[in-house]
Amino acid sequence: MLRAALPALLLPLLGLAAAAVADCPSSTWIQFQDSCYIFLQEAIKVESIEDVRNQCTDHGADMISIHNEEENAFILDTLKKQWKGPDDILLGMFYDTDDASFKWFDNSNMTFDKWTDQDDDEDLVDTCAFLHIKTGEWKKGNCEVSSVEGTLCKTAIPYKRKYLSDNHILISALVIASTVILTVLGAIIWFLYKKHSDSRFTTVFSTAPQSPYNEDCVLVVGEENEYPVQFD
């Protein structure tokens, strides 16, 4: 009974410890550096890139933005091995005609790019960007897409979760330490219980009544009485 009750006691503590260190919204998200990523594999028909973006905002995120070579490589590797995405992924980028530059939908700074070609003379109105999975390069394309085979979303880890206060760290440490202590204590109690049970079982048999005769003594039965005969 003790062994059966112990997991039920430890599970809430383990859940609390896991919640204390979890950074992404759920296990379906993947963390890299200070952000969480999810690939929505559902193919949808859209009228504009805003319809694609709504897929991400419905999950509390925005379309993907990429800010360094390491992040670009992480996305490529995860798309190939885990997400199994299409050959081209629509990036969360648009061309702003007001200042003639590309910008991210999530309002982050454009600190990195990986364009496969640069043509200053091309018309960039209604131009979006796509990540080519095989090469890892970006290419320009029309924003007026009719359908997408999957949407890649990204959200930043909240500041208050990324930099836990000292109290939260202490609570997490205490929860984990308590879990370990209870596990060890439960194992010790179970061991002592089993040892006590085995000892009592042995004592019962060791105190059972013994025959008053030894191996050299036989019982001779007469016609009227019984008496032991001892052989020398």
Curated annotation (Swiss-Prot):
Q: Anything else the record notes? A: Isoform 2 and isoform 3 are produced in HRS cells by a transcriptional control mechanism which cotranscribe an mRNA containing LY75 and CD302 prior to generating the intergenically spliced mRNA to produce LY75/CD302 fusion proteins.
**UniProt-listed InterPro entries:** C-type_lectin-like, C-type_lectin-like/link_sf, C-type_lectin/snaclec_domain, CTDL_fold
Q: Which residues form the C-type lectin domain?
A: 32-152
Kindly state which keywords UniProt assigns to this record, in alphabetical order: Cell projection, Cytoplasm, Disulfide bond, Glycoprotein, Lectin, Membrane, Receptor, Signal, Transmembrane, Transmembrane helix
Task: Identify this protein by name.
Answer: CD302 antigen
Highest taxon above the source species: Eukaryota
| Known glycosylation sites | 109
Q: Which residues lie on this side of the membrane: Cytoplasmic?
A: 190-232
Q: What does this protein do?
A: Potential multifunctional C-type lectin receptor that may play roles in endocytosis and phagocytosis as well as in cell adhesion and migration.
Q: Which Pfam families match?
A: Lectin_C
- Write out the transmembrane intervals: 169-189
Question: A cellular component term (GO) from this record?
Answer: membrane
GN (gene name): CD302
Please outline how this chain is modified post-translation. May be heterogeneously N-glycosylated in some cell types.
Residue runs in coiled coils = none
Query: Any S-S bridges, and between which cysteines?
Result: 128-143
* GO function term, MF aspect, one: signaling receptor activity
Where it sits in the cell: the answer is: Membrane; Cell projection, Filopodium; Cytoplasm, Cell cortex; Cell projection, Microvillus
Q: How does it sit in the membrane?
A: Single-pass type I membrane protein
Identify the tissues in which this protein is expressed.
Expressed at moderate levels in monocytes, myeloid blood dendritic cells and granulocytes and at low levels in plasmacytoid blood dendritic cells, monocyte-derived ma crophages and monocyte-derived dendritic cells, with no expression detected in T-lymphocytes, B-lymphocytes and natural killer cells (at protein level). Expressed widely in different tissues, with highest expression levels in liver, lung, peripheral blood leukocytes and spleen, and lowest levels in neuronal tissues, skeletal muscle and ovary.
Q: What is a biological process (GO) this protein takes part in?
A: phagocytosis
Q: What is the native source organism of this protein?
A: Homo sapiens
Q: Which residues lie on this side of the membrane: Extracellular?
A: 23-168
